[in-house]
A protein has these predicted regions:
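Metal-cofactor-dependent catalytic cores
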Residues: 1-266
Length: 266
C-alpha cells in the first residue's frame, strides 16, 4: 500500500510536550511555530528533558503567535512575542545564537517549575542558524531543534520496536514531526527525496538517538532499565550511533494534512 501521512506533531517549546495537528504549514525552518522557544540556564546554555525529565510534563501550545505553557500543578502562562525582553547570546549545542528573552513572569514560572534559575528565550527572524553543511545545501536553516527542520518516523518502525519489547512505548517518546505509514519497518531509511501533499523534502540523515526516549512522557521519569534504547541498541546500532527515524529538510513551502499521500521520489 502507498504510504500516507498519519500524524503531525509540533513542539513550540524545546523539550516540552507538543501538540498534534490535523494540518500544518511547512516553512524553511520546518513546521511553522515549531521549536521557536526554549529554556536556558544561568550560563545561557540550553536545557532539555535529557537532564530535566519534568519538561515532558509541560504542555506547550500556540494560540496565534502567543505561546501557552501549562502543567498539572501550575497556572497556565501566556507569552506574547510582542512582550519579549532584551536580546542575549545563548548556546545550543555548538551554536552561539542571539535570542530574545521572555517576559519576567515567564522566567519566574519556568524557574519555579524546574527548581533552578532559568530564562525563557525566543528565536526571532533576526537570527539564522545553519544546518550542518555536511548534510545540507547552502542557505538551509533550522530553528531550535537539535539539528534539522523535521523528523519523520514510520509507524511500522515503531511497531517493529514494540514487537521486541515486553512493554510497548509510544511514538511520542521519539518526538517525530511527521509519522507515516509504511509496508515494512524502517522503509524510510532508503528514501532520499519525498513529496507529502504538494511539499517536497530531502531525506538527509538518519536520526542518532540519545537518552531522551527512555524518559516516560507522562511521568518525566527515566526508565530504570534503559528501555527502549537498550533494545534499539541491539539491532539499530551503526557507526554513527543508534538510529531511528530520518531527518528532513523541506524544499519549498506549503500546507500538509493528515491523510496526504507520501510519494517517494528517490
Amino acid at each position: 500500500m502507498p504510504s500516507t501521512l498519519s500524524s503531525i506533531h509540533r513542539y513550540p517549546f524545546k523539550s516540552a510536550a507538543g501538540e498534534t495537528l490535523a494540518s500544518a504549514v511547512v516553512e524553511s525552518l520546518g513546521l511553522a511555530g515549531d521549536r521557536r522557544w526554549m529554556a536556558v540556564d544561568a550560563n545561557g546554555r540550553f536545557i532539555t528533558a535529557r537532564e530535566h525529565g519534568r519538561m515532558w510534563l509541560i504542555s506547550a501550545t500556540l494560540d496565534d503567535d502567543a505561546l501557552q505553557l501549562a502543567t498539572g500543578g501550575a497556572a497556565t502562562i501566556r507569552i506574547d512575542p510582542s512582550e519579549l525582553g532584551e536580546r542575549i547570546d545563548v548556546t545550543l549545542w555548538k551554536d552561539r545564537l542571539s535570542v530574545r528573552t521572555g517576559a519576567r513572569n515567564a522566567n519566574a514560572w519556568m524557574s519555579g517549575f524546574l527548581g533552578q534559575p532559568v530564562r525563557v528565550v525566543h528565536l526571532d527572524q533576526q537570527t539564522h542558524r545553519a544546518v550542518d553543511p555536511d548534510y545540507a545545501q547552502s542557505g538551509d536553516e533550522v530553528s531550535l531543534a537539535d539539528g534539522y527542520p523535521l523528523l519523520l518516523i514510520s509507524q511500522a518502525s515503531l511497531d517493529g520496536l514494540n514487537a521486541r519489547l515486553d512493554e510497548h512505548v509510544e511514538m511520542l517518546r521519539f518526538r517525530p514531526s511527521l509519522v507515516v505509514t509504511a509496508n515494512v519497518a524502517h522503509a524510510e531509511d532508503d528514501w532520499k527525496r519525498i513529496r507529502i501533499g504538494a511539499v517536497e523534502f530531502d531525506v538527509v540523515k538518519s536520526c542518532a538517538r540519545c537518552v531522551l526516549p527512555t524518559v516516560h512522557p507522562l511521568t518525566g521519569v527515566r526508565d530504570p532499565t534503559g528501555q527502549p534504547m537498550r533494545t534499539l541498541t541491539q539491532y539499530r546500532r551503526s557507526a554513527n550511533g543508534v538510529m531511528f527515524g530520518q531527518n528532513l529538510i523541506p524544499r519549498g513551502n506549503g500546507v500538509i494534512e493528515v491523510g496526504d499521500p507520501v510519494q517517494v521520489l528517490a
